[in-house]
């Protein structure tokens, strides 16, 4: 799992690449926590670009839960561009009820 973070206008975009599984969830969690800290410090929303994420286990979902708690309502975390597999995971786990999920990172669609 690789991670990229960039500022795009008035938001931060974090992009996990590959799979978040038993071997990589700790790295994902560390990158995500750092991105939330950066978003809090800059007072910017955080968009997770899931378009390059193939799969996520329950440990990755737990990392999302912890990031939401860390954000404490001060930062909005949006999940963008999930593939069909990730959409199913988010739906089955009901994470699509916890986080805004949008089709594309580009706010204009």
Feature-to-residue mapping (PLM):
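Short acidic-hydrophobic, aromatic-tinged amphipathic segments that line or gate anion-handling sites
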Residues: 100-108
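Short beta-strand/loop segment at the start of cytosolic alpha/beta domains
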Residues: 1-15
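Generic beta-structure capping elements
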Residues: 8, 17-19, 82, 104
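Amphipathic alpha-helical interaction surfaces in cytosolic regulatory modules
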Residues: 20-99
């Amino acid at each position: 799992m690789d991670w990229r973070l960039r500022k795009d206008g008035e938001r931060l975009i974090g992009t996990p690449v590959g799979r978040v599984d038993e071997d990589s969830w700790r790295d994902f969690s560390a990158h995500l926590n750092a991105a939330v800290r950066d978003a809090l410090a800059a007072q910017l929303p955080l968009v997770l670009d899931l378009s390059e994420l193939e799969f996520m286990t329950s440990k990755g979902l737990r990392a999302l839960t912890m990031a939401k708690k860390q954000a404490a309502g001060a930062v909005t975390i949006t999940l963008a561009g999930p593939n069909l597999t990730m959409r199913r995971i988010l739906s089955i786990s009901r994470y699509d009820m916890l986080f805004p999920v949008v089709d594309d990172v580009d706010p204009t669609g």
